[in-house]
């Protein structure tokens, strides 16, 4: 996989009133990924999957705070490698005709290494989990009314020198199908009900310190 064209250009761009600088990297190399995956389906409905990936020269944009001036440098850089191993299970659930759901559980081990990341090389790893539950409550068949409530939660993760706090969100939607052959559909929805989807990444690593304050927004919608 090759980096984007802009990332390999020799340029310097300033932001945040000059306190931030975005720098191009003409020395960027393509990354190479090797992977293996095994999937098992039980009784045609329970899905289990395991995988391992090794990526040489993984590239991503990083942030570094200069030690001799009040400035943050953003630059797409190659890491030595990234390794990831994971297990996934997807389980359907059903109670009569009124309730159906799908539970997905994911466990991941992640390691990232960069031995020449400025003056603070890193070799970091973490185990994190992600769980998703999609619920459908079938309230009525005539007209067809379905209430969907979906939730996701993820434990703490990392990215380069960033720490990514745990996150989660809940969405809900009410769908009504009516008229002949249910040709009309009215949908009311609310996304990120508890305003928790956005995380506040931070850096606290070898003298680097950064705290980000991001905002989450609940939003409503209607479609017909």
Language model regions located:
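Structural signature of Gram-negative outer-membrane beta-barrels, strongest in the C-terminal barrel
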Residues: 1-56, 143-150, 163, 182
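Transmembrane beta-strands of outer-membrane beta-barrel pores
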Residues: 1-3, 34, 44, 52-56, ...
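Outer-membrane beta-barrel translocator domains and adjoining extracellular loop/strand segments
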Residues: 5-13, 18-22, 53, 58-67, ...
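Surface-exposed loop/turn and secondary-structure junction residues enriched for glycine/proline
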Residues: 8-11, 26, 31, 62, ...
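Outer membrane beta-barrel strand-and-loop segments of large Gram-negative receptors
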Residues: 23-25, 29, 35, 47-104, ...
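Residue-level signature of outer-membrane beta-barrel architecture
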Residues: 38-42, 52, 89-97, 135-139, ...
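In a subset of proteins, long, contiguous C-terminal domains/tails are tracked
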Residues: 40, 44, 88-108, 199-224
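Conserved C-terminal beta-signal and adjacent last beta-strands/turns
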Residues: 124-224
């Amino acid at each position: 996989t090759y980096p984007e064209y802009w990332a390999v250009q020799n340029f310097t761009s300033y932001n945040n009133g000059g306190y931030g600088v975005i720098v191009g990297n003409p020395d960027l190399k393509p990354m190479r990924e090797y992977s293996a995956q095994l999937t098992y389906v039980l009784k045609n409905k329970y899905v289990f999957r395991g995988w391992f990936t090794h990526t040489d020269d993984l590239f991503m944009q990083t942030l570094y705070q200069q030690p001799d001036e009040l400035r943050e440098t953003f630059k797409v850089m190659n890491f030595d490698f990234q390794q990831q191993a994971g297990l996934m299970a997807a389980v359907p659930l059903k109670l009569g005709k009124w309730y159906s759901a799908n539970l997905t559980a994911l466990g991941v081990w992640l390691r990232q290494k960069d031995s020449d990341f400025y003056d603070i090389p890193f070799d970091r790893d973490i185990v994190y989990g992600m769980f998703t539950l999609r619920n459908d409550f079938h309230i009525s068949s005539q007209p067809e009314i379905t209430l969907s409530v979906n939730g996701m939660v993820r434990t703490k993760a990392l990215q380069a020198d960033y720490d990514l706090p745990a996150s989660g969100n809940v969405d809900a939607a009410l769908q009504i199908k009516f008229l002949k052959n249910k040709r009309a559909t009215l949908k009311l929805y609310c996304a990120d009900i508890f305003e928790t989807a956005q995380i506040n990444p931070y850096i606290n690593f070898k003298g680097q310190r950064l705290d980000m304050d991001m905002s989450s927004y609940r939003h409503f919608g209607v479609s017909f």
